[in-house]
């Protein structure tokens, strides 16, 4: 078990200490593996104070080290770096209830001007990520990517209604609104990666997939396979030579195409999916705390 000590530049008042004691078991990211840090390296405030873009903060958060607040000792916090496979009590900082078996990830705050501040000391405040189920994190990423792509070639007044609908997400009876999109360098990189990947999939996948679908339908007459075969037959012209004996070079070329398509699919997944940090084992009655296994 690795311990990190965070010392505050300002002297903590009794009120500050009381506030921090209520935040036990909260997940706090730090920039890198260090045994001793200052409050300036604690949480997301150094990032969100200079850049409000959700995608930018999310990309930085993905590179940060996870710690869990264990206790307050005088003017410092004691944080624990979780160990893979071990159980920890984790505080629910997100808006969504957790359920047993949930896989949890970290996302940036959805609002940069939350009415409820965890702790504010001078010009610094404690800003932590939301711990949410991976399913809703992926849905948020997908919608933000869709909005960004649509916004590239359309005027805002053309798509205002659609964007308003996409920005509202209801999950487990909780309604949230997505942050505004900023088409900066980070967002443009995501959109460029998505477009390149989709272009390569569109170019290479139909022919090789139709070959495999045609062979599979000979063995399996499921309606879904047949419908896929009908769909592909309208879009592709089957190369009859592929149905015969393939030479070694042709097999190698085919394998390269399959690997390329799967790699591009993985690229898109990396834009939308978040890694799992915790798996929920048990949830408290008020759903504000859970026993979780650390998986990262």
UniProtKB/Swiss-Prot annotation:
Its main location: virion. The keyword Transferase does not apply. It holds the Pfam family Herpes_V23. Keywords: Capsid protein, Host nucleus, Virion. It is found in: Virion; Host nucleus. The keyword Ribonucleoprotein does not apply. InterPro entries: Herpes_capsid_2. GO terms for cellular component: host cell nucleus; viral capsid. GO terms for molecular function: structural molecule activity. Belongs to the herpesviridae TRX2 protein family. Structural component of the T=16 icosahedral capsid. The capsid is composed of pentamers and hexamers of major capsid protein/MCP, which are linked together by heterotrimers called triplexes. These triplexes are formed by a single molecule of triplex protein 1/TRX1 and two copies of triplex protein 2/TRX2. Additionally, TRX1 is required for efficient transport of TRX2 to the nucleus, which is the site of capsid assembly. Interacts with TRX1 and major capisd protein/MCP. This is Triplex capsid protein 2. It comes from Human herpesvirus 6A (strain Uganda-1102) (HHV-6 variant A).
């Amino acid at each position: 078990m690795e311990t990190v000590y965070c010392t505050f530049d300002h002297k903590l008042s009794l009120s500050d200490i009381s506030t921090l004691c209520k935040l036990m078991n909260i997940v706090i990211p730090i920039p890198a593996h260090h045994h001793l840090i200052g409050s300036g390296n604690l949480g997301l405030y150094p990032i969100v104070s200079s850049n409000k873009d959700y995608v930018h903060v999310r990309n930085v958060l993905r590179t940060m080290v996870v710690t869990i607040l264990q206790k307050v000792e005088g003017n410092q916090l004691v944080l624990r770096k979780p160990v893979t496979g071990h159980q920890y009590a984790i505080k629910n900082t997100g808006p969504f209830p957790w359920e047993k078996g949930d896989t949890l990830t970290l996302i940036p705050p959805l609002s940069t001007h939350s009415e409820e501040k965890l702790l504010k000391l001078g010009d610094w405040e404690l800003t932590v990520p939301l711990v949410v189920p991976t399913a809703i994190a992926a849905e948020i990423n997908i919608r933000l990517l869709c909005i960004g792509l649509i916004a590239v070639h359309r005027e805002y007044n053309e798509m205002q209604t659609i964007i308003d609908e996409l920005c509202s997400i209801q999950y487990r009876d909780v309604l949230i609104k997505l942050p505004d999109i900023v088409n900066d360098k980070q967002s443009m990189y995501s959109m460029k990666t998505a477009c390149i990947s989709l272009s390569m999939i569109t170019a290479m996948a139909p022919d090789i997939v139709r070959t495999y679908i045609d062979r599979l339908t000979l063995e399996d007459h499921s309606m879904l396979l047949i419908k896929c075969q009908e769909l592909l037959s309208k879009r592709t012209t089957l190369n009859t030579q592929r149905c015969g004996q393939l030479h070694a070079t042709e097999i190698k070329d085919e394998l390269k195409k399959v690997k390329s398509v799967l790699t591009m699919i993985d690229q898109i997944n990396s834009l939308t999916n978040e890694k799992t940090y915790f798996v929920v084992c048990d949830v408290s009655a008020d759903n504000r705390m859970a026993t979780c296994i650390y998986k990262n």
